[in-house]
C-alpha cells in the first residue's frame, strides 16, 4: 500500500468519518489507520476477503466524492499554508499570532 494514498485516506477519514456507516468506518479505520490486512478484517467480521475489499474500494470512492463536493481537506491544507506564511512573514505581531491560533483551534476541534 503506498504511503501517499494511506495518508490521504486517513486525512479524508478524519474529515468525513461522521458521514460513513459504522461498517464503512470500521473497515477503513482498521485497514488504513490500524494497518490490518483484508484477511484480518474479514476474520474479525466473519465475511469474505472479497467483501472487505469491495467495501473498502466503495468507501474510498465515497470519501473522494465527499472531498470533490465539499473540499474540506483541500481547504484545510490551503488555510494551513496561508497561516504558516503569515506567521513567517510577521513573526513579531502578537495580535496576528493570537488570531491565527484561534482560527487553527477552530480547524482542529472535533
From Swiss-Prot:
Gene3D superfamilies cross-referenced by the UniProt entry: Winged helix-like DNA-binding domain superfamily/Winged helix DNA-binding domain
Signal sequence extent: none
One Pfam family matching this protein: UPF0122
Disulfide bond positions: none
Coiled-coil zones: none
NCBIfam families tied to this protein: PRK00118.1-1, PRK00118.1-4, PRK00118.1-6, YlxM
UniProt-listed PANTHER family: UPF0122 PROTEIN CBO2450/CLC_2298 (PTHR40083), UPF0122 PROTEIN YLXM (PTHR40083:SF1)
Functional note: Might take part in the signal recognition particle (SRP) pathway. This is inferred from the conservation of its genetic proximity to ftsY/ffh. May be a regulatory protein.
Family affiliation: Belongs to the UPF0122 family.
Name of the featured protein: UPF0122 protein SPD_1143
Species of the source: Streptococcus pneumoniae serotype 2 (strain D39 / NCTC 7466)
Amino acid at each position: 500500500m503506498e504511503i501517499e494514498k494511506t495518508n490521504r485516506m486517513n486525512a479524508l477519514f478524519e474529515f468525513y468519518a461522521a458521514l460513513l456507516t459504522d461498517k464503512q468506518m470500521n473497515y477503513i479505520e482498521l485497514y488504513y489507520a490500524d494497518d490490518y490486512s483484508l484477511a484480518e478484517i474479514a476474520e474479525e467480521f466473519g465475511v469474505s476477503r472479497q467483501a472487505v475489499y469491495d467495501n473498502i474500494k466503495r468507501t474510498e470512492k465515497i470519501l473522494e466524492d465527499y472531498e470533490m463536493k465539499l473540499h474540506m481537506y483541500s481547504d484545510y491544507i490551503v488555510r494551513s499554508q496561508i497561516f504558516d506564511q503569515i506567521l513567517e512573514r510577521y513573526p513579531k505581531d502578537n495580535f496576528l499570532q493570537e488570531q491565527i491560533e484561534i482560527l487553527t483551534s477552530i480547524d482542529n476541534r472535533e
